[in-house]
A protein has these predicted regions:
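Conserved structural scaffold segments of CAZyme catalytic domains across common CAZy folds
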Residues: 1-79, 338-339
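Solvent-exposed beta-strand/loop surfaces of large extracellular or lumenal domains
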Residues: 307-327
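Aromatic- and carboxylate-enriched substrate-binding clefts and catalytic-loop regions
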Residues: 48-211
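Catalytic cores of secreted or luminal carbohydrate-active enzymes
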Residues: 213, 217-258
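Carbohydrate-binding surface patches
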Residues: 263-300, 340-341
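Conserved, mostly hydrophobic/aromatic
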Residues: 36, 104, 115, 142, ...
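C-terminal beta-strand-rich structural cap/linker in extracellular carbohydrate-active enzymes
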Residues: 322-345
Length: 345
């Protein structure tokens, strides 16, 4: 067993899932925990700033700012089955990682997010490999952000659930970009896209260059055992439960994957299975997409109840139901920049 690796029992305790980012107060953490529990998420994240200015050498990742009662938030999360993930910038990691890990374990932290690491130089990559090993030995889950790209270390150290290394949703990518990524970046491994789904308060609406239904679909198309959802939103702003219902049910790890149709930079259709349930994500690039998907991956001899989430033509989500069987032909008609997500069970 490689140094820093873990037993199968400890590996099975690592929990993939979805997270929502909390604002930098105690109450925001508690509110996000309630939201996460209601929507079948597994984690909340305190991101940059929870221990002070992230790039300052005087900020201490061993102590939270006064606005956050971290023991209270972590304890409440345990009551509700929600883990707390903490962000630490590379400035703090380089100085204090060996102190951070035992302390966070004592606090009951579920995982870490590394920020602004050096994923380009030989020195930086060697440091990261050693840091990943250490995090893994403590049983934390790990998400590495910014320019680090997957190199296969998650095979040896399963605590490493995902990493950024991608121009994610925060940058407002267009539909050409979103339909190129499945054929390029995602060949290398998981990526945390930090979905910025708009809400009733208009968060990120001006920056979003694809439809809401495409955002739903991308959570199937894009593989990441840890998915960051609602990146710029607060729980109180998400008042339309019908629009975000799909996020409640979509898993982040899979038993089987089928790539059904697509053309790089133009469109993509992916089906993934967890247990007996299939999830489909279809996304169009900068042009309308009209095709037919054969449902040959479904189990024979039974009817599947299908829930479709698609664009309603007014900027929202429309939900409809149908029944399909193995071999059925599913028409896919998606407007440019749009998408369609499905649950088949």
């Amino acid at each position: 067993m490689p140094p820093g690796s873990m037993s199968e029992a400890r590996q099975s305790a690592l929990k993939p899932g979805k997270l929502i980012r909390a604002q930098l107060t105690t109450q925001a953490g508690l509110d996000c925990i309630d939201f996460a529990a209601r929507h079948h998420f597994q984690y909340i994240l305190y991101d940059a700033g929870w221990y002070g200015a992230e790039r300052s050498t005087t900020s201490d990742p061993l102590a939270a700012i006064p606005a956050i009662d971290l023991p209270k938030v972590i304890a409440y999360g345990k009551e509700r089955g929600i883990g707390v993930i903490l962000y630490v910038n590379y400035v703090g990691l380089r100085k204090k990682l060996d102190s951070i890990l035992p302390l966070y374990k004592q606090w009951g932290v579920a995982g870490l997010k590394f920020g602004f690491v050096d994923g380009l130089t030989q020195h930086g990559i060697r440091w990261l490999a050693d840091a990943i090993r250490k995090v893994n030995s403590y049983g934390f889950i790990l998400d590495i952000h910014d320019n680090y790209k997957p190199t296969g270390l998650s095979r040896t150290f399963p605590s490493l659930l995902t990493q950024e290394g991608i121009r994610g949703d925060e940058h407002g990518p267009d539909a050409w970009h979103t339909t190129v990524l499945p054929y390029t970046r995602f060949l290398a491994g998981a990526a945390d896209f930090t979905f910025c789904f708009p809400n009733a308060a208009g968060s990120f609406s001006k920056n979003l260059k694809v439809s809401k239904a495409q955002q739903l679909a991308l959570t199937v198309i894009y593989y990441s055992p840890l998915q960051s959802m609602f990146w710029y939103g607060r729980p109180a702003d998400y008042t339309n439960e019908d629009e975000i219902e799909f996020f409640k049910y979509v898993p982040t790890v899979w038993d089987e994957t089928r790539y059904l149709a697509g053309d790089i930079g133009k469109n993509i259709a992916v089906a993934r299975r967890q247990g007996d349930t299939w999830y489909l994500g279809c996304a169009a690039g900068m042009e309308d997409w009209d095709t037919v998907v054969k449902m040959d991956f479904l189990k024979p001899g039974r009817d599947y109840h299908i829930t479709v989430y698609e664009d309603d033509g007014k900027g929202g989500i429309r939900r409809r139901m149908m029944t399909l069987r193995r071999g059925s032909r599913l028409p896919v008609r998606i407007r440019a920049k749009g998408g369609m997500a499905m649950i088949c069970n």
